[in-house]
A protein has these predicted regions:
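Juxtamembrane membrane-water interface segments that cap and precede transmembrane helices
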Residues: 115-128, 190-204, 321-325, 356-374
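Loop-to-helix transition at the N-terminal end of transmembrane alpha-helices
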Residues: 41-57, 338
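Extracytoplasmic loop-helix module adjacent to an early transmembrane segment
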Residues: 106-119, 318-337
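Alpha-helical transmembrane segments of multi-pass inner-membrane proteins
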Residues: 2-36, 50-60, 87-94, 130-154, ...
Length: 485
């Protein structure tokens, strides 16, 4: 943090101790993380309804923050509305789309046929049913709560306390997944399962686990490198560094057990990149007595992980015909309604009208590509809103800060998940959605707190001279001419 060495001990306590809003956000974030990590069904009404209830605490947290924050925060509400604008826009698009439903019925004699009705492509549409409300409001609640991580924390020590707990939670879920694979279980412990074997831990689809593990693998290794940079850090063997490194490798190596080939390949390649960064950091920046052996071990593990990722890419069935047909159907839907798309969760309902004949009788919820499904459901308008938001925040960081290492390492995980979204459906999972925006907003907030004074990060610079139009007394600014009597 800028000029932190010149801060008095009393001011450091004021900065680093939690305010009531920070305490509330800390607890709510951990509760939401526990729920999405352990309740694996991505469309569970219990999960989505609980997330919606927890998300309703967002205005309470912000209002508490406004009343109890010790510094100037006149940018609080402008930041909130800017950060959450995409969520409100998508929710508004969904509500407007309810006025025109593209699905209808045609009755011929005693037969009833489902048809796609003509619609106005210049207005949003929606083919959703009543259950869609819970889904979209649940995801909006997740987004609103995670966005407060970019607004409420006033010190980097907040993230130094919450990130280890979040990393531990993710690693523990991965440990349970390893146990299940080792025991050869056909369904997660204490659940009825889905009937399929492509699960990991409590994630019913292991492609979702691969995206989740990618994010927290980067977070674990990023925390390792951060702890190693502190001047008062212990020798590596005696510090928490080995635990972070073990957790990151545990999460990354799970890619070898994931059946979804392309997501597992991205996970393994991301682990390779993070281990290579660790190798370079220990060789160039560390003064640890074991730095050479640590760098050598990390380098060898990076090579093995890289080789595993390449093998997964070129394995059979990495690009199956069914996935190709599903993506083609999504692209055809997009071409038929390119401006606003067909509405949230409409892909599965319209798929019978656009799918290949080889998929007749098979039920699919997703298009095997979040990007194509997003275009089919939200159109060009939605793509511009979401991508524009991400690009604007990334450009702001790159133009203003750029060299903050923890932020860079966390954003590597976010970028890897966006790559997975090109060929799989990670954002269908509430756990991945929550983890992505949690890490994204933490990374950006860390950058802001690292390069700004604590009393200026959320405030305009104070104007010590009041404008003439706002003064309550007359202002004389003309040249004084003395008159002799």
């Amino acid at each position: 943090m800028a000029k932190s060495d010149h801060i008095l001990p009393r001011d450091k306590l004021l900065r680093d101790n939690f305010t009531p809003a920070e305490t509330l956000l800390f607890g709510v974030t951990l509760i939401m993380a526990s729920m999405v990590n352990w309740i694996g069904d991505p469309r569970s009404f219990w999960l989505l309804g609980s997330l919606l209830i927890i998300g309703c605490l967002t205005p309470v947290i912000l209002k508490t923050h406004e009343q109890t924050h010790p510094f100037f925060i006149d940018l609080l509400w402008p930041k909130f509305w800017v950060c959450t604008a995409p969520a409100w826009i998508f929710l508004l698009q969904f509500i407007i789309g309810l006025i025109q439903n593209p699905l209808g019925t045609l009755i011929l004699g005693e037969s009833i046929f489902n048809i796609v009705q003509p619609i106005n492509i210049w207005l949003p549409s929606s083919a959703s049913d009543s259950s869609t409300w819970v889904t979209i409001l649940g995801f909006v609640a997740i987004y609103l709560l995670t966005s407060t991580l970019y607004i409420v924390p006033k010190s980097r020590s907040y993230f130094e306390r919450i990130l280890p707990l979040l990393c531990f939670g993710a690693v523990f879920v991965g440990f349970i997944g390893y146990i299940q694979k080792g025991l050869g279980l056909t369904k997660p412990i204490f659940t009825n399962g889905t009937g399929a074997n492509d699960f990991f831990a409590y994630f019913p689809y292991d492609g979702h686990w691969a995206a989740f593990a990618t994010l927290w693998c980067c977070a674990c290794i990023a925390m390792l490198l951060l702890s190693n940079r502190y001047d008062d850090s212990l020798p590596f063997i005696q510090s928490v560094g080995p635990w972070y490194l073990t957790g990151g490798i545990l999460l990354g190596a799970s890619g070898m057990l994931v059946e979804a080939l392309l997501p597992s390949a991205v996970l393994l390649l991301t682990l390779s990149v993070m281990l290579l960064i660790t190798t370079v950091d220990f060789l160039t920046n560390s003064k640890d007595i074991h730095r050479k052996s640590i760098a050598l071990s990390s380098g060898l593990a990076a090579c093995l992980s890289f080789a595993g990722g390449i093998v997964r890419i070129f394995q059979d069935d990495a690009f199956s015909s069914n996935m190709f047909y599903l993506r083609s159907a999504a692209f055809d839907m997009f071409k038929a309604n390119p401006i606003f798309g067909w509405g949230f969760d409409s892909y599965s309902k319209l798929l019978p009208f656009y799918s290949n004949d080889l998929l007749v009788g098979q039920k699919y919820e997703r298009a095997s590509s979040d990007l194509l499904q997003f275009l089919a459901e939200f159109g060009i308008f939605g793509a511009l809103i979401s991508l524009g938001f991400l690009i604007a925040f990334i450009l702001r960081y790159l133009l203003r800060f750029r060299n903050i290492r923890l932020t860079n390492h966390l954003l590597i995980g976010c970028g890897s998940v966006l790559l997975i979204a090109l060929c799989d459906v990670p954002f269908m999972s509430p756990a991945v959605f929550f983890s992505f925006f949690t890490i994204f907003f933490i990374a950006l907030r860390w950058a802001d707190l690292s390069r700004n004074k604590i009393d200026e990060v959320d405030a305009h610079r104070p104007h010590l001279i009041t404008a003439e139009t706002k003064r309550r007394v007359p202002l004389f600014n003309k040249q004084y001419e003395e008159e002799e009597k």
